[in-house]
Amino acid sequence: AVEAVGVEPGATLRGLARDNDHLLGETYHSMAAIRFGDYIAKISAAPLSDNVRALTGKDVGTVEDATMRDLVVEHFRDQGAEYQLRAQLCADLDKMPVEDAAVLWPEELSPHQPIATLRIPPQDAYSPARRVYGDDVLSFNPWHGIREHQPLGSIMRVRIAAYERSTRYRHEMNAQPRVEPTNIDAIPD
């Protein structure tokens, strides 16, 4: 749309402008770096099982408010999914800066290395109990990880305060205690 007024979109805007492709077929990247033991890395998750690889680039048509959620719920009702968790190690701080998360790290300098397989079983992904638990109880914060996976860079330092304020406000508004699961069994069915 910005092209219609004679403006060429920058890398950030191009990254935000998404096709209406199925979410489960996408490869997700951390963008910001994390500590990876004694190394620095960016993390990604790529479709691995045939069923989610088949969704890569699959246009889902017109997207309404609940379209993507409904597609994910429908998928997991009968099927699981596998994703390859990968690390891209920093090999050159000049070409792979930690402080500027907008810089894409060149794969020719450091290809993504598989580090784990995420296996997600079939499930009722949006039951009323899970919706309340996910929306009202849980909080997301990249700083919840272990020290060996500490977030790095300026954007991550800003996020620590922003996420803390956001979760505090949300828990107060929802009148929910702030708890973090320590076991998969804490997540309702």
Predicted regions and their residues:
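Active-site-adjacent core segments of small-molecule enzymes
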Residues: 1-189
